[in-house]
Each structure stands twice: as structure tokens, then as C-alpha cells.
Amino acid sequence: MASKEPAWLAFARQQIGVREIVGPKHSPVIMGWVQRLGIKVLGIKVVDDETAWCGTFVAMCMMIAGLASPAIAVRASSWATWGRELLGPRLGCVLVFTRTGGGHVGFYIGEDATHFHVLGGNQGNAVSITRIAKDRLAKGGMRWPAGVALPAVQVIRLNAAGVPVTVNEA
């Protein structure tokens, strides 16, 4: 019997295809998340969808599930100390990655031999599923919400065919 997806991941899947609008106009969906989360959750004032919004997306998914976010949720690196650290993946766990000039955060949906398959925001300027190299996972960068029952380790093997690889989510 397949395990039920966490509420935050179910919401995240519903958002696949939401895109930022490059230039002077901004996505009403993304800006709606920014407005709903506000400075108190995001930690800074966000005025456009040009600001890196992977952390905003994860925070919105957690809010929908009734869960708290880290102090400066807009920053991907803030998620590396949020909740509890995992030593093995679970469907929907938060993955925090390093990259030149910043970081990235998204949700585990599976993996192949060399990459995690990540559902996240601001991946190619959209909510999408992409592959990110396992060696980019930040120290302590596999996380689970505090106070939420922890399922068994769940390695989900996926085929890499047709899933793009990203090296810079900015």
C-alpha cells in the first residue's frame, strides 16, 4: 500500500507550472504567497518575483499544512537548521542545497544514482521537478518538520530520463 503524501507535498504538486513573470510584471500567484506569508515569516520585505523565491514556495507549502517556517524563510540556507535533521530520505522531506551565490531548497520526490529529484519553486523560474546533484546537498540539508511523525526511510528510485538537471536555480 502506498503511503499518503504529506499535506505540504500535495499542495506543492498542485502548484507545478506556476511561473514567475520576468521583467516589470510579476506573477499574481507568487506575489499572493509573498503577501500571505508577509515579512514576519519571510524575514525580509519582498516586492517582486525576481527575488529568489524557492524558500517562499517551501514556506507557503508548510503554512498550508499548518507548520512553521524558519526565521528567515525566504533564504534557502535558513531551512538547513529548521525542523529535525534526517539521515535518510522520506517522501516530501525538505532538501537544502548549496550553489555559487546562494542556496536552494525544495522537496524530495525521489532520486537516481547521482541526483535527487526535487519539486521546488524558482527552478527554471517556475514550480517544477528537476534533478539536482547529490553532492550539492548542504551539511544537515535533509530535514523533516518538528512535531510531525517521522515515517520510515523511503528511498524512491526514479529514472532520470526526461527530467532536466539544474546547476543554478537563481
Where are the predicted features?
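Intrinsically disordered, low-complexity, compositionally biased regions/tails
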Residues: 21, 27, 87, 110, ...
